[in-house]
UniProtKB/Swiss-Prot annotation:
Disulfide bonds: none annotated. Coiled coil: none annotated. Forms part of the ribosomal stalk which helps the ribosome interact with GTP-bound translation factors. GO terms for biological process: translation. One or more lysine residues are methylated. InterPro entries: Ribosomal_uL11, Ribosomal_uL11_bac-typ, Ribosomal_uL11_C, Ribosomal_uL11_C_sf, Ribosomal_uL11_N, Ribosomal_uL11_N_sf. Belongs to the universal ribosomal protein uL11 family. This is Large ribosomal subunit protein uL11. Part of the ribosomal stalk of the 50S ribosomal subunit. Interacts with L10 and the large rRNA to form the base of the stalk. L10 forms an elongated spine to which L12 dimers bind in a sequential fashion forming a multimeric L10(L12)X complex. Signal peptide: none annotated.
Length: 140
């Protein structure tokens, strides 16, 4: 018989650097999950992607066991890395903070394709371009 799901917790943690401090500790502690076990497994699973923020969806079961699925990093994080900027523009329509090539946008769209609800790579690219525009990044 399948285990009964108690909760689904969504978090965004730095790859390979999850620790029991907030936000991980309080989010999982209230469901009775072994926080250190999660941190250890998450850090092993994301060690190769160090420096990126990785969204994770943790499914907590009735017996306090858990499973988790890691997603691709948010488009905004990938765009900031590609443009070589620290923060996005506060006024994106007036002040541009960086430039990203169409080839780089396509690369990001291909990486994120499985997490986006886009039918084609072109549609995924348009979504990524929209994110870039709202951050003040020019597409060249």
């Amino acid at each position: 018989m399948a285990k009964k799901v108690v909760a689904v917790v969504k978090l965004q943690c730095p790859a390979g650097k999850a620790n029991p401090a907030p936000p991980v500790g309080p989010a999982l502690g209230q469901h009775g999950v072994n926080i250190m076990a999660f941190c250890k497994q998450y850090n092993e699973a994301t060690a190769a992607q160090a420096g990126l923020i990785i969204p994770v969806e943790i499914t907590v079961y009735e017996d306090r066991s858990f499973t988790f699925v890691t997603k691709t990093p948010p488009a905004a994080v990938l765009l900031k890395k590609a443009a070589g900027i620290e923060t996005a523009s506060g006024t994106p329509n007036k002040k541009k903070v960086g430039k990203v090539s169409r080839a780089k946008v396509q690369e990001i769209a291909e990486m994120k394709m499985k997490d986006l609800n886009a039918a084609s790579i072109e549609a995924a690219m348009r979504m990524i371009e929209g994110t870039a525009r709202s951050m003040g990044i020019e597409i060249v």
